[in-house]
Regions:
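Hydrophobic alpha-helical membrane-embedded or membrane-associated segments
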Residues: 12-16
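A short hydrophobic/aromatic micro-motif that marks alpha-helical segments and, especially, helix-coil
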Residues: 17, 106, 163, 238-239
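Mid-domain, small-residue-enriched loop/turn segments at the edges of structured enzyme/sensor domains
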Residues: 153-235
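Structured C-terminal helix/loop/strand segments within mature extracytoplasmic catalytic/sensor domains
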Residues: 3-11, 28-51, 219, 224, ...
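Short amphipathic alpha-helical segments
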Residues: 25-26, 96
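Active-site-adjacent loops and short helices of periplasmic peptidoglycan-processing enzymes
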Residues: 32-190
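Twin-arginine (Tat) signal peptide motif
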Residues: 1-7, 17-24
Length: 316
């Protein structure tokens, strides 16, 4: 596939989830209006068109959209249990556990955390060329806003990957797989033995040959159903004892740069996406929740993923 073609398809697959969820919400709003209402007809038609555009993309697609908590008002789905590579979408779980530890008094958002070659890795637009310390709050913001992998590994190292997995298990998310660190994941798909961290700058000069990102050793993956379940639970404060913890979770999730690319302006949104172009596989995912309706109280929780190539998708 030519690069220009792939870029166009990638942009479409990023925007599609937001088109789907917004259309779903507008179509639901129409159920309270006369069937001849022009806006309602356009919303329903727009949703159908958005669904068709998303499903017409090359490769494997999966989505789940709940209008209302638990899909109480409407539900839209296409292979929601498909196990797909979801890239950086998993970073929401790291944020959740970190804020739980702050809430419990185990960590502080004001703590100074080290940025150096011991944690540095690729895919770090914020911390790639920086050294020194910065407060934990800035690390969490970099992890979600710009999907900075160095920030993610710093945050994961503070809370412990196994404790993030324990939160995932508590939420009942059986399909979700996360790495101990993004650098360990990159080391493996760059050709290092399982469990071997190439370090920095070892990941800049990997041994090869490359491995598929979706594999049975170390990966970043899950189903649309589980991501929707997570956001519905987390944003209903299922995992946070204090209202201020939920406010901070929402504040940071609302900073994700993917939101501005995909969600209509002035729409409250809390989300995280992920993408990875890789030999033989290019993927995009986007998951979270927007709030719509005249009263601004109707949650639309969503996850959409697409994989172009050989995703080794499985039902789990």
């Amino acid at each position: 596939m030519q690069r220009r073609t792939f870029v166009a398809l990638a942009a479409a697959s990023t925007a599609a989830p937001a088109i789907l969820m917004t259309g779903a919400a507008l179509a639901q709003d129409d159920t309270d209006h006369d069937s001849t209402d022009r806006r309602g007809r356009e919303a329903s038609g727009g949703l159908d068109a958005a669904l068709r555009r998303f499903l017409a993309l090359p490769g494997t697609k999966s989505y789940l959209i709940h209008v209302g908590q638990g899909g109480a008002l409407r539900r839209f789905a296409h292979q929601p249990d498909l196990f797909l590579f979801t890239a950086s979408a998993y970073k929401t779980f790291v944020l959740g556990q970190y804020l739980r530890d702050v809430e419990a008094g185990l960590l502080s958002k004001d703590e100074q955390l080290a940025i150096d070659d011991g944690v540095r890795t690729l895919g770090s637009p914020v911390f790639m060329n920086l050294a020194g310390t910065t407060q934990a709050r800035s690390v969490l913001e970099a992890m979600i806003t710009h999907s900075d992998n160095t920030a993610t590994d710093i945050a994961t190292g503070k809370v412990g990957a196994d404790r993030v997995r324990a939160l995932i298990a508590q939420a009942g998310l059986r399909s979700i797989r996360i790495p101990d660190t993004t650098r360990l994941f990159l080391s493996y798909i760059f050709g290092a033995p399982a469990g071997v961290d190439l370090g920095w700058p070892g990941v800049e000069n990997p041994p090869g040959p490359p491995r598929p990102p979706l594999n049975d050793a170390i990966t970043l993956a899950g189903s649309a159903r589980d991501f929707v379940s997570w956001y519905e639970q987390a944003l209903a404060r299922a995992f946070f004892a204090k209202p201020e913890t939920l406010r901070e979770f929402k504040r940071i999730q609302a900073m994700s740069e993917q939101i501005a690319k995909a969600v209509p302006s002035d729409t409250p949104a809390y989300a995280k996406g992920g993408e990875l172009p890789w030999p033989g596989l290019s993927t995009k995912s986007f998951a979270g929740q927007i709030v719509v309706g005249g009263d601004g109280r109707t949650p639309v929780t969503f996850c959409a993923s697409s994989s172009i190539g050989s995703p080794r998708a499985m039902i789990r």
